[in-house]
């Protein structure tokens, strides 16, 4: 099975969870990133050559992004009443539904912020994600994906495909 076929199957169960349940996973991920920051910093520094404070800034950005989406996302995904075309005659309710599978191709220079940071809102919205990190920073991406799985993202909902794109 391809990563996309597995993601399509796994996405249905993930989308069936409420946005609040998915937000709890993102909050747990936030906590895990901060608990294991030394390991993440070591990996990111080794792969990118960044100074420790720059790697920390990216790691912290990812954790805070996760927390932000976990806090505001469920409200953004809730049905919203909107003005109808004819104000007194119509009511309109906007509903949000997952798209299915989201593909992310990320560069080497911000392997956590641009790879995982982009995956977080997609996951919160109930989508599955297939991530293809740059070949120079695969271990950093795999580290973050392992934390997301530990936080509660089900198997198949978040996959990593490694290769040079050929």
Language-model region placement:
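N-terminal Rossmann-like NAD(P)+-binding subdomain of aldehyde/semialdehyde dehydrogenases
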Residues: 1-90
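Rossmann-like NAD(P) dinucleotide-binding subdomain of oxidoreductase/dehydrogenase enzymes
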Residues: 34, 81-166
